[in-house]
Amino acid sequence: EGTAAGKKDVRYPLSRSFYLVWNGKLNSVEEEFLRYIRSAGQEIVGQSYVTVSKQNSFLSLKPKGKITITGSTSVGPLLECLAEEYMKQNPKASIKVTQTDSGNGINQTIQGKCDMGMSSRELRDPEKELLNYEVIARDEIAVIVNAANPLNDITMDQLEAIYTGKTTEWKAIYR
């Protein structure tokens, strides 16, 4: 059983983190956009996802600049909403979100082809060494099975084993 959207509960076992990654020091617009996501933006996060920080008030200092963000199609719609709402508070900012995939967003950020990347997968150790990153939301995953299936609970590792073909029968899980 999952938690209601907007509830901060990182104990839910079938969830994944939504990451925002960047390379090096943030400029003033990037810094403020990240501050917005951490504070007032969590209200938007909470409409469909699990929040990761307290929903505090936000006051824009209205820095001027552009941000290009590339990556995950899972994170993209959330980032588009966050960018749209942030730009209402700071009309001097321009944020372009391009949805590709997590790996592309991470690689484009490492290569300096975009300012920030979006990822819905865990970062690998070399990526963690090269980039700064922050979890901006958590996405709960629901698994739907036949009502006759006796399984009441499953871990991410067990679910991965099913999807990668390492486990091919349900009975291997509920032994």
Report each predicted region and the residues it spans.
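Exported/periplasmic ABC-transporter solute-binding proteins
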Residues: 1-175
